[in-house]
From Swiss-Prot:
RNA-binding keyword on record: yes
This protein's name: Nucleoprotein
Localization annotation: Virion
Annotated function: Encapsidates the negative strand viral RNA, protecting it from nucleases. The encapsidated genomic RNA is termed the ribonucleoprotein (RNP) and serves as template for transcription and replication.
Keyword Ribonucleoprotein assigned: yes
Gene Ontology molecular-function annotations: RNA binding
Entry's Gene Ontology cellular component terms: helical viral capsid; ribonucleoprotein complex; viral nucleocapsid
Keywords: Capsid protein, Helical capsid protein, Ribonucleoprotein, RNA-binding, Viral nucleoprotein, Virion
Length: 527
């Protein structure tokens, strides 16, 4: 199998779409990543796709069919790429890291076993793949000019693998540190931060590696943002979590001052503030940017076309219309479904029905979404809970022997963009989830559970009289009470209409439909 050489890097005439503020607009009419042109984003995607291809084919010694169909092969290939990327990134910043020590030690290779297959990685070969693919488009000696942009997009390619681990184990604690012996991990339970047990599934991303959390700070769940800011020191890294808090809770009165107070105080001072913020979030949702993640091996193939001579050609036009949150992601999912009809997937899971549900949750982050919404938008009527997947997570482990079993991804009937703003126009209990995290922004009928009603009972009205603990708690308590008073046992949410998935093409969206699916009060993590 050959891959066509990268297109010429000579300047070509391009069209740049802008909004009224002169900012470039990406697919779906959204503002493009700051400082990054559409041409540059396409170049980065191409470079990463080439890396995945060469790691799978040249280093792992796997086939093009493995690249397309074996979800786990792609995840492990992306793991190596993410590691070597952070190795070069740390070197460029004159820093030290555990991955740097691993790459720079005396051995030339390292090995791991994936479902009965021993894979040997040559470090210099891995470095070479990364450097060759990057320098197709970027000047290696000007790493500061491109590393930040590459880092963000690279993290989005790596998101699928990180989320697959999260779907296995719901976060319940914040990792404070890993001791030098690498055997002791210091953690603090979320309840130590004032987070109700029934809302720990809002901690999406909490167990991601620090480099992933930092790269995608504005896509982390609200609990993750709160605990990271609670522990943050007032340094260059804390700013990311301040910004993430301001975005996620931008609908909260005086959030700028609240963020400033939280940064300056220790976790023990912030417990009631955190609890009130999450109680409010249970009703209103939060504004972090939700993301759709694709299996990296399959995505590398989806960005190419295969000709009659078995040669892959990068499809620049398709890549330019691709994104991780809007119509571009659903367009790619439609293409994904067509490719998988001829090339069914494998995840080392025998039961195809369970495999396709795990894939869907990992791609769309729907392990925190209400089953009523999922039943309405897909061809699946019987969604399973985490307790139904014990055997499947055993066979998913890399150390487990190979398990035969192919499956096809879940078909969609309707779609809407994933949430990046409040999903409502209106501004407790035990460890079972008290409400869902809204992933899709399509219209819905929400239910208010008794557990949700009980949140914040320890304690938009008043202004903030002073920047102190008591004043902030009073403000949030009164704001929560005003929100509770505005809601009954159910309310209408959603900011856009659902669209027909079968009408979606690369050039137009599906037709809008008048529907408002109702929640049923159950999610993947429910008891």
């Amino acid at each position: 199998m050959e891959v066509d050489p990268a297109p010429s890097t000579a300047p070509k005439p391009t069209r740049k779409r802008v909004n009224n503020s002169g900012e470039e607009i990406g697919s779906g009419g959204k503002r493009a990543l700051t400082g990054l042109s559409l041409t540059q984003k396409v170049a980065i995607h191409h470079a990463i796709a080439l890396m995945v291809y060469h790691v799978v084919i040249d280093i792992f010694k796997c086939t093009i069919i493995d690249l397309i169909t074996d979800v786990n092969i792609g995840v492990y290939a992306m793991n190596q790429i993410w590691s070597i990327h952070n190795y070069f990134r740390t070197k460029n910043n004159s820093g030290r890291s555990s991955i740097g020590a691993k790459i720079d030690n005396a051995t030339d290779t390292y090995q791991f076993i994936l479902h009965g297959r021993t894979i040997t990685v040559n470090k210099e070969e891995l470095k070479g793949v990364y450097k060759r693919c990057i320098t197709t488009y970027f000047d290696w000696d000007k790493m500061n000019d491109w590393m930040g942009s590459v880092h963000t997009i690279m993290a989005l390619w790596n998101l699928f693998g990180s989320r697959l681990s999260e779907v296995r184990i719901m976060p319940s604690a914040n990792t404070i540190s890993v001791e030098k012996d690498n055997r002791t991990t210091v953690v603090k339970d979320f309840n130590q931060y004032g987070i109700p047990a029934g809302m720990r599934h809002f901690a999406t991303g909490a167990d991601f590696k620090p480099t992933m959390k930092s790269a995608l700070a504005q896509s982390m769940g609200p609990v993750t943002v709160l605990v990271q800011l609670s522990e943050a020191k007032d340094n260059q890294y804390a700013g990311k979590w301040v910004d993430a808090l301001k975005r996620a809770f931008s609908h909260i009165p005086h959030i700028d001052q609240i963020a400033k107070f939280m940064l300056a105080n220790k976790p023990a001072v912030l417990t009631k503030i955190n609890g009130y913020l999450m109680a409010i979030a249970g009703y209103t949702g939060t504004r972090e940017q939700k993301r759709i993640a694709f299996p990296p091996g399959t995505l590398a193939y989806l960005l190419h076309d295969l000709d009659k001579e078995n040669k892959l050609h990068f499809n620049e036009d398709r890549c330019s219309k691709f994104d991780f949150s809007g119509a571009g992601a659903f367009r790619m999912y439609s293409h994904f479904l067509k490719v998988c009809k001829k090339n069914p997937l494998r995840m080392n899971i025998a039961d195809p029905g369970k495999a396709r549900q795990l894939l869907f949750h990992t791609m769309f982050g729907t392990h925190v979404e209400d089953f009523g919404i999922l039943q309405s938008m897909t061809d699946v009527s019987d969604w399973l809970k985490r307790k139904d997947f014990e055997e499947e997570f055993k066979t998913l482990r890399a150390s487990h022997a190979r398990v035969e079993g192919n499956f096809y991804p879940i078909e969609m009937r309707y779609y809407s963009k994933v949430c990046s703003s409040l999903n409502t126009k209106m501004i407790g209990g035990g460890s079972a989830p008290v409400t869902n995290c809204q992933i899709f922004s399509g219209n819905r009928k929400r239910i208010v559970t008794e557990g949700l009603k009980s949140l914040g009972q320890q304690g938009v009205g008043a202004g903030l009289s002073a920047l102190d603990k008591d004043s902030i708690e009073k403000l949030l308590r009164e704001h929560l009470e005003s929100i509770k008073a505005a809601f009954g046992d159910s309310f209408e949410a959603g900011t856009v209409k659902w669209r027909k998935f079968d009408g979606l093409t690369w050039d137009k969206e599906g037709d809008e439909v008048e529907m408002r699916p109702g929640e049923v009060g159950e999610i993947y993590w429910s008891n």
